[in-house]
Amino acid sequence: MKFRPCIDIHNGSVKQIVGGTLSDRGNQAEDNFVSEYDAAFYANMYREDGLTGGHIILLNKADSEYYEADLAQAKEALTAFPRGLQIGGGVNLQNAESFLDMQASHVIVTSFVFRDGRIDWDHLKQLISLVGREHLVLDLSCRFVQDDYYIVTDRWQKVTKQHFSV
């Protein structure tokens, strides 16, 4: 078994939110835990403990008043653990390379590769061409709806038409 650490950043703080409570309206989420430490603290701890393959998730939208604070936290964490963490949250063609330039090992993407509830293969191919498949993680987070699991996008708020049977 391998432990994969996570740093979730919302409204400029490292926190754990209650699943399904994230809302773009008012940048709100129900907090389960808000850390007194910054993202760099956790990145340093993960580096010192040899915990690779972890990720940072920016939970605010890019047009949120808190996005720059989220991004500043992420930059500090990536500086503390260069190439040791992946990053996701609003990744697209305009910013994917900048995250890798900030020393992320990979970019994590979901919403950008979906359009009208379906996988947009052109967007996926463009992203692969831009950053290389070796630096790309496709997050297929799912939610159970009726009798099946469906991929969710846009900070787990939008259920797509793409389902998985189990």
Model-inferred region functions:
Residues 2-10, 54-56, 83-89, 107-109, ...:
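Hydrophobic faces of well-ordered beta-strands that scaffold small-molecule active sites
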Residues 10, 15-25, 100-166:
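Conserved anion-binding
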Residues 20-44:
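Short catalytic helix/loop segments, enriched in acidic residues and glycine
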Residues 40-44, 71-78, 96, 121-128, ...:
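Generic structural signal for well-ordered alpha-helices
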Residues 47-50, 100-101:
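Non-catalytic positions within long, well-ordered alpha-helices that form the structural scaffold/packing
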Residues 51-72, 111-118:
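Glycine-rich, proline-tolerant flexible connector loops at the mouths of alpha/beta enzymes
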Residues 64-86, 124-141:
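Alpha-helix-loop-beta-strand connector modules within alpha/beta enzyme cores
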Residues 73-106:
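Catalytic cores of alpha/beta
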